[in-house]
Amino acid sequence: MPAGSNEPDGVLSYQRPDEEAVVDQGGTSTILNIHYEKEELEGHRTLYVGVRMPLGRQSHRHHRTHGQKHRRRGGRGKGASQGEEGLEASAHDTPSQRVQFILGTEEDEEHVPHELFTELDEICMKEGEEAEWKETARWLKFEEDVEDGGERWSKPYVATLSLHSLFELRSCLINGSVLLDMRASSIEEISDLILDQQELLRDLSDSVRVKVREALLKKHHHQNEKKRNNLIPIVRSFAEVGKKQSDPHSMDRDGQTVSPQSAPATNLEVKNGVNCEHSPVDLSKADLHFMKKIPAGAEASNVLVGEVDTLDRPIVAFVRLSPAVLLSGLTEVPIPTRFLFILLGPVGKGQQYHEIGRSMATIMTDEIFHDVAYKAKERDDLLAGIDEFLDQVTVLPPGEWDPSIRIEPPKNVPSQEKRKMPGVPNGNICHVEPEPHGGHSGPELERTGRLFGGLVLDVKRKAPWYWSDYRDALSLQCLASFLFLYCACMSPVITFGGLLGEATEGRISAIESLFGASMTGIAYSLFAGQPLTILGSTGPVLVFEKILFKFCKDYALSYLSLRACIGLWTAFLCIVLVATDASSLVCYITRFTEEAFASLICIIFIYEAIEKLIHLAETYPIHMHSQLDHLSLYYCRCALPENPNNHTLQYWKEHSIPTADVNWANLTVSECQEMHGEFIGSACGHHGPYTPDVLFWSCILFFATFIVSSTLKTFKTSRYFPTRVRSTVSDFAVFLTIFTMVILDFLIGVPSPKLQVPSVFKPTRDDRGWFISPIGPNPWWTVIAAIIPALLCTILIFMDQQITAVIINRKEHKLKKGCGYHLDLLVVAIMLGVCSLMGLPWFVAATVLSITHVNSLKLESECSAPGEQPKFLGIREQRVTGLMIFVLMGCSVFMTAVLKFIPMPVLYGVFLYMGVSSLQGIQFFDRLKLFGMPAKHQPDFIYLRHVPLRKVHLFTLVQLTCLVLLWVIKASPAAIVFPMMVLALVFVRKVMDLCFSKRELSWLDDLMPESKKKKLDDAKKKEEEEEAEKMLDIGGDKFPLESRKLLSSPGKNNSFRCDPSEINISDEMPKTTVWKALSINSGNTKEKSPFN
């Protein structure tokens, strides 16, 4: 078409006959039958493919400045020879190269790709009713069909297409109208422009035009518009509000629109080019539930196919609107339409049109074609996108697969980035460099060489995030985490205090443990570098306290004073470690050490939970082999002890109890226990009369807590109830379980053992206060001698704290606010010194509680397409949950009336749940299960691809041996050296370099997530296969792109193929019989349909 010709506004001038000349079997039609000379066509091609053209446009018509040479007739000089070379070369451009060239072009505001929602509508005829467009399928990521009954959507599934329908779609784009960047504001205007274009391509009578226009303007019926005879829809449209421009995403979740005054147009709305003027949208018909799944800024792609009785051959049009327009009633959800594909044909081929429509809708959801559709400048670009799609498809044999079977969406969809990346001359594909395997390298662990240099960097790193640590806690998930972990932390703190009270004769007991945990936890949550870590008591600390108390008792030293000296020295040594950046040594702690330590702690939790349940049999024994015939002879009564011990005699003396005058047989159980009486009789146990059913009821509570907690936690992935309900139940899983078990225990009434919380805030012993003198009655030299045990204690604190911190700061947790190893250790050191002066227990990072805390705060994508698995986004990093846990723990003294109803077996069940759940994802246990598994049944673990199985077993055996040694030391009187053994694991790992290669250790001993490493491995393997099959030409020209990658330009020096196995699907497709048949049909008389 001459440059000076006038076109209807919205029809682009790119549809010149020269650009319509698709290299195929001559099936391309022209607009005005204007024939260009071969030289001109060749020159045009040479200019387009040989030079990277900018996307800047003189006008919306998209004319490119070709210069005078483009308009010359005749002249077989230099320009013509270049044109011939370009034409010959362009025929050999692979679709992949062409697509990479298209995607490498500059972007402008009108061609920025958005997320797409695609809808397939078909003309539906009902008896006695007027024909209308009916929604039959939709795509956000996967396909959803309206079931035959028409009452519901199908489950999302992976769309399977026939190759024939894809060929037919390609033929449609070759022979139909392609209107890019049409400017229109209504469906009426779009219909007129399409029909105007059709009249240029073919003879279209007025009657046919009227019928087709009527068909295009018919009402659209969507699946969500069910019968509402009993409902009065509240029709609220943009027109009624004042026809003001408003973004469709300015709706709230109840369907109310935000007024233009309260929601001014944002830069995003202007950038998206949404034109909502004169587009009344009935929000009462919008599917607001489905709207939540559509990302903000998404646009629509409408596919309209159907039969019109007045047509003798199909009308095909592909339209891209610029800007996107909000068309009332066209789409199921009120979002602007960017693309339309229209296929109207003669009656009798409805199923064929349906499959072509499905193919168009499916290909629009393809990540690569989606971008090509946004950036395409002409028909050839769209065809290149389809050819590239065909080049990547996987074919299922017809005799081995039933197409009616719906394929479930995969859990992980492979990345398509590789398809976007250009080839390089040696045949390799440019790819992003993988992240380094394993290790903890990062700025947090770099030695600065300055005094407190690491601490200063930690403070600078965490300070900008401090206030966001409180704002980010405004979530229901944080409330669930706080309630769950409060219950989980209370029991071990009280239990630890009770054990410590027994070991120290009450000098440090439950009330001191509660107070110390609360004070230390609050300070740590407020000022630590990684507030996700939960502080708690550890077994080695208890062993250290027992040994120290025994030493002080043997040498008549004051236990609390000597302990205060040791604590102050330990705090000082930890501060020295902070000053010298000793935390940088954490980089030597690899997965080998982490997993051994974490596995041990998890096993200890599981073991102690079961052990505590079994110990209930001592207090509540089972009366086995009961002789029911002698049941009437059983009795248990209180009596005066025959041989009272000194403690009992002292009690009687202090309370002036006349033992001879007491009627012991008439005392109740509680009165007998209070007066230190003795139970005698065949129905008595060690601690009083037999209490029936307590042990069995405790076992029921224990296992029920574990099973219900595990079930509710996985409820998020179940098929029942809406997403919000499932997420809430999953977040509150443990708290709901504890609450349910408490109610059940209260209703059953069996006297199970309950949580005992101190009810008075004062020291356990009257002979001590809240401040302990470091010297006290001890000799002065004890202050200096205390540095010796303090060295061992420092190693204990450092290893416990930093190994837990390393586990929490793993890369797979995707933490964004950084970590602070030096700052964490400083806060722990200061609070350790404070607790020592106050006579309170020492607290360090608790591994299992910290892992459980992190797991309870996992973030997943909320806006996920139907069928798409939510993506793990990271952890909700904040300080409030830890702060509230320890604040409420300090207030527990005043909540005794409520806490006394919590059965201890329920808390033991929570311990079991935390231990088992924390084991998930530990590679060591996955490798341990391989021992009893035949090779053909072994999972596709990434390390099994690269490391021989015998080496994997050897690595696991070494790790298992170390774990057993740690367990033996932990359970023996030598438990005080446990931190030294954990430190020894680092050296064991170093020795393993002699038995394993670096490559094997990189796969077996690192911190990289499994899914990510497997993705890189699959990409690398596919790259090697492609390298073996394809060899790209070395002489291709290259253009520097914004991404700083090299892109081979289509159309120059690409005609020579070194590898005869390399094919160009665009060249090979016309050679197929199927394509020849389609081409012959499309070239026949106009009376015939091209879809025979």
From Swiss-Prot:
It is a multi-pass membrane protein. Residues 243-255 have a biased composition (Basic and acidic residues). Glycans are attached at N646, N666. This is Electroneutral sodium bicarbonate exchanger 1. Residues 58-76 have a biased composition (Basic residues). It comes from Rattus norvegicus (Rat). Residues 500-507, 587-595, 709-731, 800-824, 903-904, 984-1092 are cytoplasmic. Belongs to the anion exchanger (TC 2.A.31) family. Changing A845C: 40% of wild-type transporter activity. No effect on cell membrane localization. Expressed in the Purkinje cells and dendrites in the molecular layer of the cerebellum (at protein level). Expressed in the hippocampal neurons (at protein level). Strong expression observed in testis and moderate expression in kidney inner medulla, the submandibular gland, eye, cerebrum and cerebellum. GO terms for molecular function: bicarbonate transmembrane transporter activity; chloride transmembrane transporter activity; identical protein binding; sodium ion transmembrane transporter activity; sodium,bicarbonate:chloride antiporter activity; sodium:bicarbonate symporter activity. It is found in: Cell membrane; Apical cell membrane; Basolateral cell membrane; Cytoplasmic vesicle, Secretory vesicle, Synaptic vesicle membrane. The chain crosses the membrane at residues 479-499, 508-528, 566-586, 596-616, 688-708, 732-752, 779-799, 825-845, 882-902, 905-925, 963-983. Coiled coil: none annotated. Changing D800C: 40% of wild-type transporter activity. No effect on cell membrane localization. It catalyses: 2 hydrogencarbonate(out) + chloride(in) + Na(+)(out) = 2 hydrogencarbonate(in) + chloride(out) + Na(+)(in).
